[in-house]
C-alpha cells in the first residue's frame, strides 16, 4: 500500500540554544488508509511530530512528504487542506455561535455553494451523531459532544488525513469509547488515514500500527499485539491494559492463557471457551 505520509530524518528543537532536540532525526511513514498510533512519555515528541506534519512548526532539518508533495512554505496551505486536526481541548477550536455554524466555518473559504455547505454540515453532524444538536450553542454541550462536533468540523472539509492529538484525554470512559467508535466509522466511510496520540492502550488496540517515541526519537514500531506483549510498558510511559493485568493475575493462580489479548472482549471470549 502506498504511503500518504513520509517523514525523513526530521529534527526540531523549540530553541536553538537547546543542547537537546525535541524531535531527533526521525524517519517513518504512514500508509494510505492506515490508523497509526503514536505513544510515549510526556515530552517524548509525539505532539511536536504531528505539529510538524501539519506545518504548525517548521523543522530544523529533514523533510516531510504528504501525498507525494514535499512540505514547503510555498505549498503549506494546500497541504493543510488534506489534514484535519482535533486537539485535547475542543473549546479552543470553537468559533461559531451554534454547532452548525461552527462546522460550516471551515467551509466558507472553499468556494462552495451554500447548498453544498449545508449538505456537508448535515452529513458530518449526522455521521458523529450530533445532527439533533445543530442549533445548540457549543458551550451547552458535554465534553464528549464538543469533541464530536470538532471532528464533524474536520470531516466536513473532507481531509485525507485525520490527526487526533490527545483528543479523548479529557473524556470519561464512556465518552472515549463513543468517540473512538465514531472515528472508526468515519475512517471506514471516507477511507481516511488516522494518526492518534494517546496513552490509553485500549484505544491503541484499535490501530493498525504503533510508533513508540522516547526522548524525541523513535524507540520502536510494531503492531498493537506486539506492543502489548512487551514487559516494559511502564518504562515507555504506558499503562498495562486491563486484559494483560487480568491475564497475569490468572496466570499467578494457575490459569495460563496462551495469547496476548488486545481488548477485554477478546479475553472474555477466550475465558468463555475455557469454562
List each language-model region with its residue ranges.
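Conserved ABC ATPase signature
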Residues: 137-141, 145
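The feature captures the beta-strand-to-loop junction immediately N-terminal to the Walker
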Residues: 39-41
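Conserved ABC transporter NBD signature motif
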Residues: 62-70, 79
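Conserved ABC ATPase "signature" region
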Residues: 115-133
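Helix-to-loop junction immediately C-terminal to a conserved catalytic motif
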Residues: 54
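Catalytic Walker B motif of ABC-type/P-loop ATPase nucleotide-binding domains
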Residues: 162-165
